[in-house]
From Swiss-Prot:
Segments of skewed composition (Basic and acidic residues): 194-208
Record's compositionally biased regions (Polar residues): 151-174, 292-301, 310-328, 413-428, 443-475
Lineage of the organism: Eukaryota, Metazoa, Chordata, Craniata, Vertebrata
GO biological process: energy homeostasis; entrainment of circadian clock by photoperiod; memory; negative regulation of membrane hyperpolarization; positive regulation of CREB transcription factor activity; positive regulation of transcription by RNA polymerase II; protein homotetramerization; rhythmic process
Name this protein carries in UniProt: CREB-regulated transcription coactivator 1
Gene: Crtc1
GO cellular component: cytoplasm; cytosol; nuclear body; nucleus; plasma membrane
Residues under site feature: Required for ubiquitination and degradation: 571
Amino acid sequence: MATSNNPRKFSEKIALHNQKQAEETAAFEEVMKDLSLTRAARLQLQKSQYLQLGPSRGQYYGGSLPNVNQIGSSSVDLAFQTPFQSSGLDTSRTTRHHGLVDRVYRERGRLGSPHRRPLSVDKHGRQADSCPYGTVYLSPPADTSWRRTNSDSALHQSTMTPSQAESFTGGSQDAHQKRVLLLTVPGMEDTGAETDKTLSKQSWDSKKAGSRPKSCEVPGINIFPSADQENTTALIPATHNTGGSLPDLTNIHFPSPLPTPLDPEEPPFPALTSSSSTGSLAHLGVGGAGQGMNTPSSSPQHRPAVVSPLSLSTEARRQQAQQVSPTLSPLSPITQAVAMDALSLEQQLPYAFFTQTGSQQPPPQPQPPPPPPPVSQQQPPPPQVSVGLPQGGPLLPSASLTRGPQLPPLSVTVPSTLPQSPTENPGQSPMGIDATSAPALQYRTSAGSPATQSPTSPVSNQGFSPGSSPQHTSTLGSVFGDAYYEQQMTARQANALSRQLEQFNMMENAISSSSLYNPGSTLNYSQAAMMGLSGSHGGLQDPQQLGYTGHGGIPNIILTVTGESPPSLSKELSSTLAGVSDVSFDSDHQFPLDELKIDPLTLDGLHMLNDPDMVLADPATEDTFRMDRL
């Protein structure tokens, strides 16, 4: 059956093809018949017109323009030499009677001879529209194309006046020409762009040449205007003659390019966010989370209007008083830890915490913007990191999320932004906050950011190298405006802290060649355990040190690491921090390092954190960290 069906199918196809060809040829012959009928009438009219207008045109054109009589004779000869073009003249002459014929001819003429066509159709066919007075006025604009080729002054005149004349056109030929241009310009006039340019002085009418400078200045803005006749026929050939090198970008609204590319693999759910890029903050519900770093020229003064703390509601803010001030800066991490209470922190969070980039040279702190409306999770993300600051200190947007009455857990994500500066790695991990469904406070600090290293000591944590630890000690007491911090933080504790941090750095550098747990991430565990688990005062003592307040209501803080680490690290970290989970301190002793007696994380502990296969021995351990029992 297949062999018998194939010949039938082919024969049917051939029959259909022949039928279509026959129909097309019949239509074409009919059109040509009409053209041949109108051609004779046109020739008679043309001869009479040239006899009438010949003497006056010599005075009309003058100077360097060609002889009028030669123009008339050449135009008449042109009708005999190029029958298709002359038939084009013919149909344009008799458009009122043969509108359909004219339309069909123009489509065939454009498709068949796109370069010769404008010579006649545009010379005469366009004039049929532009001069509504009568056929007597058709021929002088026919020679404006000649004027254009021979005289520059005539070029300017012809570009100005015929466009005005064509603004009066009410005929149907302009609509036909526009329709044909929209159909055929992409194919035909692209291929012959150069020849069209050479022929444009002779072939294109004055309107096209008049609009050519406009289209060259602003390429392709009006490629397909709806009802504007002048721009449509004029700008389409001009934009295609550009060769596509200057595309029309006016209608394409590109978003501003992100300096740090978004991670295509990050899941939208915040608890599982692999925060290896700042784009994950968009999923974490941080309205203030930005899309990357500022340009080097951007200063903190430029950003306070954009950066606003993410706040759930004023009731939640006042009831919950849990502030997160993730201020991350390479050189002086502790300088940003200004301890305030909830409402004052809320208003100063956009910048009071985040404008100090380096301990040597902190930039001026701009006035923070007023806090956003109660639910401001839809606000546009602010820029995360300012690269152009001299000390390489990225400015972080404030992420102040105050706990609601149901104590929704906070998930602080620190997606590592890619470093933008060639000399340093300033791409500090911005911290986004999200209220997830888990009741426990899960502070996600990214573990994949090599950008957390200071330019001065690339392998040590910011501000904790031996050279910069004195700065860390001095700025720690100076920035903490709270009297408790100034009284309790002694030089001995600060030095011990810096030594412990250096010890962490040495341990970390031994195993973090893959930058899975860079020095910044280990300090997230250690300092949060040593310094930050104070239950009464908010404020981040360190960008790596995740010190959060519970105001007596949040004794349990779980540090989890997303980044490149598996999600099971939250359980492992909870097991490692189980010893300090229930510690909650009053404002009487703010830095209870001696009371905590926390040993620094050993290599075994860090390997345990690195182990993705490790699970909690007791699954009930997770329940001890939950907040619903409060």
